[in-house]
A protein has these predicted regions:
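Active-site beta->alpha N-cap acidic-glycine motif
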Residues: 3, 8-159, 165-189, 194, ...
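Short strand-loop junctions, especially beta-strand C-caps/beta-turns
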Residues: 48-50, 86, 195-197, 270-274, ...
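Solvent-exposed, acidic/flexible segments
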Residues: 59-67, 120-127, 163-174, 200-204, ...
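Short secondary-structure capping/turn micro-motifs that flank functional sites
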Residues: 90-91, 150-151, 198, 227-228, ...
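Catalytic domains of cell-wall/extracellular-matrix polysaccharide-remodeling enzymes
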Residues: 119, 123-127, 133, 146-293, ...
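N-terminal propeptides
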Residues: 309-428
């Protein structure tokens, strides 16, 4: 039942608050993007787990595939989406269906999209027409994993699930879909979301390491569009209506309380069945888009949203904005929570991430993890900078910056991140 999933999520939050130390964010090449800073009424929508080549459920759209219904609805409102697609789950066997209404409804050991034993109706491999329609109509496609296998253990809800054995397997899985999109469609993927948001992996690696290797940003979300959890109503019509209401009413209340609530936010949706094999998104998406339109919002892809501002705490009104955008394209200057924290003092580890070439910083950290199973987020960059005399060999990553290489910076007396980035001499 859906209450198990809800209980698991609540339990995880409690454990995080009471037992687990607060997550430490660090400067890296990949950051988790949940929302961006903007005063404009612009937001993004993402659609996970498709494309789906089966009809909506219940089918009231003359047999159209669910993905076609979603694309029709987006077109009706002039909206664009980011479709977080999978490749193909037909390799995810042997397996069996779990209990309807549970997290394992579509498979005990693996996920199957759009449903178990219907894998040939789901994913990019089997839905060339839908992928081409997404691209032709200006939507974005992102990488949700070729086989949609979780990156590591997730005991609260998916304790029986198979997971990828480590870093290399995750890179290989993502590369299969990445290669297909490039070779078949000439399309370059730039964003990804890990299956079920599982980040920790075997060997001390995380999804951030994988995405850095792939050249991706981590596409998260700040608002749950809902619909994926089933209603407990026994009557199917009442259940569907409850699920539609669960998608629309929280959005309505948020807008009534604060018309600017969704500025810069990323809204999560599902391109597939919920746990009861219904698709309330087919019926609720239009209502959500109508609400957003009523309040003057433009609904865009995550990529377009990031063109407004790629950062959570710095917008276009900041005098350093353009330089920061340019720097972030080639250097690690943003924390993993997508914040710049410009007014804080910079540490030596953060300086090393600014100075070290991307490939050196990433490859050295990966090599250390392979060798020892442990590596700090700045160890690769620190190693390079020490070898090349860019930082003092005796300094530690957590030490405050007290001096800068003269050839690379204008004069700085107060070593905040803002001042250091402003003083950095950009490469011609």
């Amino acid at each position: 039942m859906s209450w198990i999933v809800k209980l698991g999520k609540k339990g995880k939050k409690i454990v995080k608050k009471i037992i687990t130390p607060a997550e430490k964010h660090y400067v890296g090449y990949t950051r988790r993007i949940e929302r961006v800073k903007t005063g404009e009424r612009i937001c993004a929508m993402t659609f996970d787990d498709g494309p789906m080549g089966l009809p909506a459920s219940p089918d009231r759209f003359e047999g159209k595939t669910l993905t076609d219904v979603l694309l029709d609805t987006l077109a009706q409102y002039g909206a664009k989406g980011s479709f977080d697609v999978i490749g193909d789950t037909s390799e995810n066997y042997p397996d069996e269906a779990g209990k309807l209404g549970s997290a394992a409804w579509g498979g005990v050991k693996f996920d199957h999209y759009p449903d178990i034993h219907c894998d040939d109706k789901g994913g990019a491999v089997h839905n060339d027409r839908l992928i081409r329609r997404m691209l032709d109509e200006g939507h974005q496609i992102t990488n949700h994993g070729y086989r949609h296998i979780i990156f590591g253990k997730k005991p609260f809800v998916y304790g029986a699930r198979e997971y990828l054995p480590g870093f290399d397997a995750a890179v290989a899985d993502l590369t299969r879909l990445d290669t297909q999109m490039r070779e078949r469609y000439g399309y370059t993927l730039t964003l990804a979301r890990p299956p079920h948001y599982v980040d920790k992996m075997a060997g001390g690696f995380t999804s951030y390491d994988v995405y850095e290797r792939m050249g991706y940003q981590y596409m998260a979300a700040s608002f749950d569009g809902a619909g994926w959890l089933p209603s407990t109503h026994e009557d199917p019509e009442a259940a569907l209506q409850a699920e539609i209401d669960a998608m629309v009413e929280p959005m309505r209340k948020a807008l009534e309380k604060d018309p600017d609530f969704f500025c810069g936010q990323i809204i999560f949706q599902k391109d597939g069945y919920n746990m009861a094999k219904r698709t309330p998104v087919a019926f609720a998406l239009g209502k959500q888009l109508a609400l957003l339109k009523e309040y003057g919002y433009r609904v865009v892809s995550v990529g377009e949203l990031m063109e407004e501002s790629p950062f959570t705490d710095v917008g276009r009104d900041d005098p350093l904005f353009e330089k920061l955008v340019a720097l972030a394209k080639t250097r690690a200057i943003v924390f993993t929570d997508n914040k710049l924290r410009l007014d804080d003092k910079m540490t030596v580890g953060e300086l090393a991430m600014l100075l070290a070439p991307r490939d050196e910083a990433i490859s050295r950290r990966v090599a250390q993890l392979r060798k020892t199973g442990k590596a700090g987020p700045y160890d690769g960059a620190m190693s390079y900078c020490r070898e090349n005399g860019l930082i003092d060999a005796s300094t530690k990553a957590e030490d405050a910056v007290t001096r800068l290489p003269d050839a690379m910076f204008d004069k700085v007396t107060d070593f905040t991140r803002r001042n250091i980035y402003a003083a950095y001499k950009m490469e011609e």
